[in-house]
Amino acid sequence: MEKILALESTVIAHGLPFPINIDTAVELEELAAETGCSAKTIGIIAGQIKVGLSREEIVQIASRKDVLKIGTAEIPFALAKKMWAATTVSATMRIAHLNNIKVFATGGIGGVHKIDQWDVSQDLAELSRTRMIVVSAGPKSILDLRSTVEMLETFQITVVGYKTDELPAFYCKSTSIHINRVDSFEEIASIFLFKEKFNLPGAVLVFNPIPDEHAIEVEQFEEWYRLSEHDLDASSVKGKGVTPFLLSRLAHYSKGKTVRSNVELLKNNVKVACEILNQLSKMQ
């Protein structure tokens, strides 16, 4: 089994500010290489799907103003229009699956929005049908966490917490929402192999909490979020623009703390994902 780890490109184009986005993208690939894995950042370059962006393509995705944020549904649109596009969790999973990649590391998954509960991320639909190990620091903190967890259960997505039985929420380490716990990479690989054996659809979604030293207290986050939400209400931003807008305002109010935490949880997720990938390769 070739040890390839999928990485998304939306965090480069819309999740982190320039030039931190470029530095982080490069560092994540280097971290994977140190473990014997090959990280492939996925994106669409001028209408062509790329599994493994070059350094120059990463710089372009990070700095261009015309990079579309796409889920699975928009992949054919971006290809037909020959666009530059950054792939979210859903689009990255779909492309990775088509290329026989079985492990994917990301920051936070999308879910049910607090502001508009009809605004539900395509990530949940893709997680429900694509068999892959996805390592994440939890649903993004800006989401309705309980509704998101209910949707994960309804869609029969296998959710486990790595060394935790409490749902992490991206910047925040704990939420008092119970999830099933695993304590080893072998357990995670075994769960995935049973899904393969019995042809069960959907992801093994591994929630890996942000390290203690980089976590943000829930009360502090909620204060920054209220200010950011007020800015959103005063703006005309809708749909796919909501999350990048809120992340930008959170970075402003936290004086960059949320950006630093985002980078650290990404690095932590890549390390854990590579350990899982190495274990999976031994067991197949």
Swiss-Prot record:
Keyword vocabulary terms for this entry: Glycosidase, Hydrolase, Lyase, Manganese, Metal-binding
Residues of the active site: E8 (proton donor), K140 (nucleophile)
SUPFAM superfamilies hit by this protein: Indigoidine synthase A-like
One GO location term (cellular component): cytoplasm
InterPro entries per record: Indigdn_synthA-like, PsuG
Gene3D superfamilies assigned: Indigoidine synthase domain
GO function term, MF aspect, one: metal ion binding
Keyword Nucleotide-binding recorded: no
One GO term of the biological process aspect: nucleobase catabolic process
Binding locations of substrate: K69, V89, S121, Q122, D123
Catalytic activity reported: D-ribose 5-phosphate + uracil = psi-UMP + H2O
Pfam families in the record: Indigoidine_A (PF04227)
Catalytic class of the enzyme: lyase
EC number: 4.2.1.70
Binding site for Mn(2+): D119
Family: Belongs to the pseudouridine-5'-phosphate glycosidase family.
Oligomeric and partner information: Homotrimer.
Role according to the record: Catalyzes the reversible cleavage of pseudouridine 5'-phosphate (PsiMP) to ribose 5-phosphate and uracil. Functions biologically in the cleavage direction, as part of a pseudouridine degradation pathway.
Official protein name in the record: Pseudouridine-5'-phosphate glycosidase
Organism: Pseudothermotoga lettingae (strain ATCC BAA-301 / DSM 14385 / NBRC 107922 / TMO)
Gene from which this protein is expressed: psuG
